[in-house]
C-alpha cells in the first residue's frame, strides 16, 4: 500500500470524525439552556477535540517529513544508480572497442544471427506441424474407411546390435580404434583394414622391433648439494689470534728459563741509578724481559705509599751527575714505602727528640764522628757495584779557622742556615778510608742579615731509640731536599 493512499485514508477518517463532532457540538449549542451539565460536557468535549486535532496535525507533519526524507534518499539513490550505469556502459563500450581490434565479436551480433536462425527454424517447424496435422487428419479418415483392413506392422530400419556387458573393453569402445599402439613385447600387428585418415599424422611403427627385455628405470633421487646441507654449529674453543699468545705452557717456560744471577749482579741492578721514577716504557720492557721463571722475589713498585716486604737497601739516594740538582726531590725505586730517617743527621731533626734523650744523642754523636763515613760511588752508571764505592772522607778534627764555600741549597731548612764568616778560617786535610787526602778550599761565607751563626758538621746518621708518644713524621720532600744539600756539600769537598 502506497504511503499516499494511507495518508488519504486517514484524512478521510479525520473528516468523518470532525463532521460527527461538529454535529454533536451544534446539537449541544442549541440546547444550552437545558442543563448546566450539558454546557460543561460540551466544553470538555470541545477541548478534547482541539487536543486531538492538534495531535493529529503533529502526527501528519511528522509523517510528511519522514516521507519527504525517504523520497529524497530514494531520488539520490536512483541518480547514483543512473550515473553508475552510464559509467559502466562507457567502460563496456571502451572494452569492446579494444577487444574488437583483436577479433572479438560482440554478443549482440551473435544473438542476432541466432535469432534469425531460430525464426527460420520456427517457421519450418510450424509448416511441418501443419503438414503433420493434415496427414493425421487424412490418416484418421482412411482408418475410418478401412477398418476391416489388417494393420501392417512397420519393421524398424535397423536393430541395434546386442551389447554384452561382460565383454572385455576394446579401443573402439573409447573411440581409439584409429590410433595404432606399439606392443612392448612381440611384433606389431598389421591392421587388416586401413583406418580412416585422422587429423593427426602419426608415423607408422617399424614391423621388426628390437626384442630386448625392458630395463627398469633408475629411480629419481634429489641430489643433496653441499650448499643446501646444514652447516654444523661452530664450537668456540677460546682460540683466536688474540689468545694464541696465551697458549705458552709451563714446559716452554722451563726451556726459556735463564740461570739465576749472582747476588752482586742483583745489587748492581738494585743500586743502579734511575731517573728517580722509571718511565712506563722501561717498566714494560722490564716486565717483558723478566718472563723467565726465576726464584720468587718481591717486585719493585714505583708507587709511593705501597707496602711490600723486601730486603733492606740503603735509603740514601745515589748521586747522579746527569740529574739536575735544581729539580724537585724525587723518590728512588728502592725507597721503602714507609718514611725512614734521613741518611744524615741535621739540627732540625734533633729538635724533634725529647730533652731527656739529648745527652744520649750527644754521646752517640761524638762516637760517630770518630768513625769513617762512606758514600756511594758517583760513577755507578759505569757498572761499578756498591762494594767498590770509595769511603767517605774522615773528619779528623773540626777547626773553626776556615769553612768551605756554601753552595745554593734546595731545602727550606738549608736556606735558613747561617755560617760563621771568618776570613782566616780553613779546614785541615781529611784522611779518607783508602789512605788518600782531601783538601778543602779556604773560602769566605757571607753573613746573613739576621746575624745568626751556626756550625755545620758532617756526621753519621744517628739511630732514634725512643720516640715521643705521637711522633710527627717529617714531610718527605723536605727531608729529601736536606739530603740533597748534604750531597752537594760532599761533592764540592771531593772535587
From Swiss-Prot:
Composition bias, Polar residues: 378-387
Phosphoserine modifications at: 295
Protein name: SKA complex subunit 3
Annotated segments matching region Disordered: 119-165, 355-391
Bias kind Basic and acidic residues: ranges: 119-135, 355-368
Keyword rRNA-binding: no
Keywords: Cell cycle, Cell division, Centromere, Chromosome, Cytoplasm, Cytoskeleton, Kinetochore, Microtubule, Mitosis, Phosphoprotein
Subunit structure: Component of the SKA complex, composed of ska1, ska2 and ska3.
Function: Component of the SKA complex, a microtubule plus end-binding complex of the outer kinetochore that stabilizes spindle microtubule-kinetochore attachments, promotes alignment of chromosomes at the mitotic spindle equator (chromosome congression) and assists suppression of the spindle assembly checkpoint. Kinetochores, consisting of a centromere-associated inner segment and a microtubule-contacting outer segment, play a crucial role in chromosome segregation by mediating the physical connection between centromeric DNA and spindle microtubules.
Name of the gene: ska3
Organism: Danio rerio
Any one GO MF annotation of this record: microtubule binding
